[in-house]
Regions:
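A helix-coil-helix interface module used to build multimeric assemblies
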Residues: 1-125, 129-130, 134-149
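Conserved small/polar residues in nucleotide/adenosyl-binding loops
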Residues: 150-159
Length: 160
């Protein structure tokens, strides 16, 4: 795996050793120890989605609050409501904006729930989800590491 070799060589340089001195830091034995693409890739995707979705949350809130403000501002403006591409019954423009705001409030709740579910990762499951070839306690320990740089409190999934 080329990425493991790059990481191993960067670690070697950082430690003051020559690139390729794999007796000190080996691409497979050290960098890739107890990992598999079947647990690392999905976990990395979950961590990335958790981080990026955190940027969406305040934007959704700001948009909802703007729509709520417009709902109040336009509470007295009458308009024709529409359904099935046809004119329907009268409503206020404020009611329409309030409906949009209500939908965004539901989206905010769903996003918060999805973000919570993204904290469950399958690191430590290794190739087939059993954790075979990983030392005891590895999954629990590796799930604690993202906290140091993302503030994410990841936890191991009960079923890999």
């Amino acid at each position: 795996m080329n990425a493991n070799e790059v990481i191993a060589n960067l670690a070697l340089e950082h430690l003051g050793h020559d690139k390729g001195d794999y007796a000190v830091v080996h691409p497979n034995d050290h960098v890739n120890a107890s990992q598999s693409t079947n647990d690392v890739y999905p976990s990395a995707l979950r961590l990335a989605l958790w981080e990026k979705s955190g940027q969406l949350q305040p934007q959704l809130t700001a948009l909802r609050q703007s729509l709520e403000a417009k709902a109040e501002q336009f509470a007295g403006i009458l308009k024709i409501g529409r359904t099935q591409l046809q004119d329907a019954v009268p409503m206020t423009l404020g009611q329409e904006f309030a409906a949009f705001a209500s939908m965004l409030a539901a989206d905010e709740r769903r996003l918060a729930q999805a973000r919570e579910e993204l904290t469950e990762v399958n690191l430590g499951g290794t190739a087939i989800g059993t954790g075979i070839n990983a030392p005891a306690g590895y999954a629990e320990q590796v799930c604690r590491r993202p906290v140091s740089y993302t503030h994410l409190r990841a936890h191991e999934t009960p079923e890999h």
